[in-house]
């Protein structure tokens, strides 16, 4: 590898399905940067060795995906965001020190800012699900100043665990209490896999949501979930999962290649075409 060419990679197992190379190669071309982005299929038993010798493998940083996100936290110097979410998805060097962060938070908030400017005028949000993605969403909303987050999960204990982690602005509610929480929610976010291709649908009557509410779905296959379609039918603004995927990639690129890229309509169209059934 030429000394002038900087390269990053995606470490996962499996990882071949990822659109990250498409996204980063687009930005490299747009910005005229001599660089590369590869996929490294690394099994769990080889992950620690690979990460601890990332420079030796020719990389200035990496994205991390399933099943390595929690292990990456332990092998690096994590920031506040990675610790809060309990997982790292982006690795980068600070001198010889390998640091980690979680860019899902910036991806979620950046997508909302781009798709529904002014979404944060509402002080109340309703978040569905209490998994890893929910932690990133809750952290981002609290950081942005949302005063009350109703958190619905089928297992109320998992929602209570997030309240214990993030404080009393997070209010756990039973899944059956979602209808009662809708009238006061200026933002509704689905962080579950419900509505994803091959998964059960997410069935919620949105008629009680305020007329100026925003609906966000982290699912991006299909691009327009039933939840988003129902929101659009009511005239509500929406933010889809593909937008979050694109925006979460921005900071990693900046850390590795020293230039902050932009999420453009052209990039979105490129990834949409790649996601389309062949």
From Swiss-Prot:
Signal peptide residues on this chain, from the entry's feature table: none
Q: Which GO terms describe its molecular function?
A: NADP binding; shikimate 3-dehydrogenase (NADP+) activity
Some GO term, biological process aspect, for this entry: which one? shikimate metabolic process
Positions annotated as active site in the UniProt record: 69
Q: Does the entry feature the keyword NADP, yes or no?
A: yes
Give the Enzyme Commission number. Answer: 1.1.1.25
Print the keywords alphabetically: Amino-acid biosynthesis, Aromatic amino acid biosynthesis, NADP, Oxidoreductase
- The gene name on file is aroE
InterPro entries (alphabetical): Aminoacid_DH-like_N_sf, NAD(P)-bd_dom_sf, SDH_C, Shikimate_DH, Shikimate_DH-bd_N, Shikimate_DH_fam, Shikm_DH/Glu-tRNA_Rdtase
Q: Which pathway features in its UniProt record?
A: Metabolic intermediate biosynthesis; chorismate biosynthesis; chorismate from D-erythrose 4-phosphate and phosphoenolpyruvate: step 4/7
- Please write the reaction equations for the catalytic activity of this protein: shikimate + NADP(+) = 3-dehydroshikimate + NADPH + H(+)
Keyword Nucleotide-binding: yes or no? no
Relate the assembly described in the record.
Homodimer.
SUPFAM superfamilies attached to this UniProt entry: Aminoacid dehydrogenase-like, N-terminal domain, NAD(P)-binding Rossmann-fold domains
Quick one: a GO cellular component term?
A: cytosol
Question: Which amino acids does the record list as binding NADP(+)?
Answer: 80, 129-133, 218, 241
- The protein here is known as Shikimate dehydrogenase (NADP(+))
Q: Which family does it belong to?
A: Belongs to the shikimate dehydrogenase family.
């Amino acid at each position: 590898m030429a000394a002038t060419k900087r390269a990053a990679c995606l470490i996962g197992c499996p990882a071949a399905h990822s659109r990250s190379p498409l996204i980063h190669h687009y930005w490299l071309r747009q910005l005229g940067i001599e660089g590369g982005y590869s996929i490294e299929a690394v099994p769990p038993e080889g992950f620690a060795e690979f990460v601890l010798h990332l420079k030796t493998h020719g990389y200035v940083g990496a994205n991390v995906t399933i099943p390595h996100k929690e292990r990456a936290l332990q092998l690096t110097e994590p920031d506040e965001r990675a610790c809060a979410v309990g997982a790292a998805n982006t690795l980068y060097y600070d001198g010889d020190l390998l640091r980690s962060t979680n860019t899902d938070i910036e991806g979620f908030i950046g997508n909302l800012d781009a798709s529904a400017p002014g979404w944060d005028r509402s002080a109340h949000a309703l978040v569905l699900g209490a998994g890893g993605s929910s932690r990133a969403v809750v952290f981002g909303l609290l950081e942005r100043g949302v005063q009350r987050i109703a958190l619905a999960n089928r297992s109320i204990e998992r929602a209570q665990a997030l309240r214990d982690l993030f404080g009393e602005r997070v209010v756990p509610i039973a899944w059956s209490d979602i209808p009662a929480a809708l009238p006061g929610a200026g933002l509704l976010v689905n962080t579950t896999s419900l509505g994803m291709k091959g998964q059960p649908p997410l069935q919620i009557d949105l008629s009680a949501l305020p007329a100026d509410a925003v609906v966000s779905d982290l699912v991006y296959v299909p691009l327009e979930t039933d939840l988003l379609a129902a929101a659009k039918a009511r005239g509500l603004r929406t933010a889809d999962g593909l937008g979050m995927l694109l925006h979460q990639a921005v900071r990693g690129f900046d850390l590795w290649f020293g230039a902050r890229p932009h999420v453009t309509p052209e990039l979105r169209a490129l990834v949409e075409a790649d996601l389309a059934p062949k």
